[in-house]
Amino acid sequence: MALKYYKPTTNGRRHMSSLDFGANLTTNKPEKSLLTILKKHSGRNSQGKITVRHQGGRHKRKYRLIDFKRNKDDITGIVKTIEYDPNRSANIALISYIDGEKRYILAPKNLKVGQKISSGPKSDILVGNALPLAKIPEGTFVHNIELKPGAGAKLIRSAGTWAQIQGRDENGKYVILKLKSGEYRRILATCRATIGVVGNEENSLVNIGKAGRNRHKGIRPTVRGSVMNPNDHPHGGGEGKQPIGRKSPLTPWGKKALGVKTRNPKKPSTKLIIRSRKETKK
């Protein structure tokens, strides 16, 4: 999808860019049967406490039900439309199956309207088809990857992301994947993945241009802890500009902020990571 640039008619327009939706999208009307209401929570939980900061005030939107499991085996589907989804960075494709059912999937790069797709172990290695990792040859780029068989995809769902199959272990139980971040990890060979790279890869190149566009998306400002009140942040308080008053910078919850690993070392999936993204960049 191409980028669209604007003339500097105002300070907000200067350097602003956006995606040219007319170049790739085929409709602006979503499938009504696959829409649900998406309530606004502004980052609050059921007690009204903020659990996710910097959220609130976004435009009204409806949620598109996406098929992350891709479990409709041995039934051919045809790509009817490529659509915009306000809930994610990737575009989505409406698939109409020969039995009459319709489903949304993530739209991979180079997926075309009218193209046939399928799911299951017997599917061909073509863009948009979903297969168990055990059936996909080495060197193939995949996305929409499951972590547990049948649980639905959890990895590689954002625009422009991919993973490449590097090999298999001795027993054939695990498949080794290289992620775009540089991480190498094992995933069960019975987990499913979709062939291809997630489309809309220019999404990361968009220049927001002005604060109002982020507010429209529901992203509120992020400010320094030193300009907050002491009840909001350990760095807050004082008359005017003040040092943080601590030996080292802290998070809003009082934990050390610099050089501290945040991943739980007892997390079960740690043993499946062969090489972390940080080790790859060294």
From Swiss-Prot:
InterPro entries: NA-bd_OB-fold, Rib_uL2_dom2, Ribosomal_uL2, Ribosomal_uL2_bac/org-type, Ribosomal_uL2_C, Ribosomal_uL2_CS, Ribosomal_uL2_dom3, Ribosomal_uL2_RNA-bd_dom. Residues 215-282 are annotated as: Disordered. One of its GO terms (molecular function) is structural constituent of ribosome. SMART domains: Ribosomal_L2, Ribosomal_L2_C. GO terms for biological process: cytoplasmic translation. The keyword RNA-binding applies. GO terms for cellular component: large ribosomal subunit. The keyword Oxidoreductase does not apply. It comes from the Bacteria. Keywords: Ribonucleoprotein, Ribosomal protein, RNA-binding, rRNA-binding. Belongs to the universal ribosomal protein uL2 family. One of the primary rRNA binding proteins. Required for association of the 30S and 50S subunits to form the 70S ribosome, for tRNA binding and peptide bond formation. It has been suggested to have peptidyltransferase activity; this is somewhat controversial. Makes several contacts with the 16S rRNA in the 70S ribosome. HAMAP family: Ribosomal_uL2_B. This is Large ribosomal subunit protein uL2. It comes from Mesomycoplasma hyopneumoniae (strain J / ATCC 25934 / NCTC 10110). The lineage of its organism: Bacteria, Bacillati, Mycoplasmatota, Mycoplasmoidales, Metamycoplasmataceae.
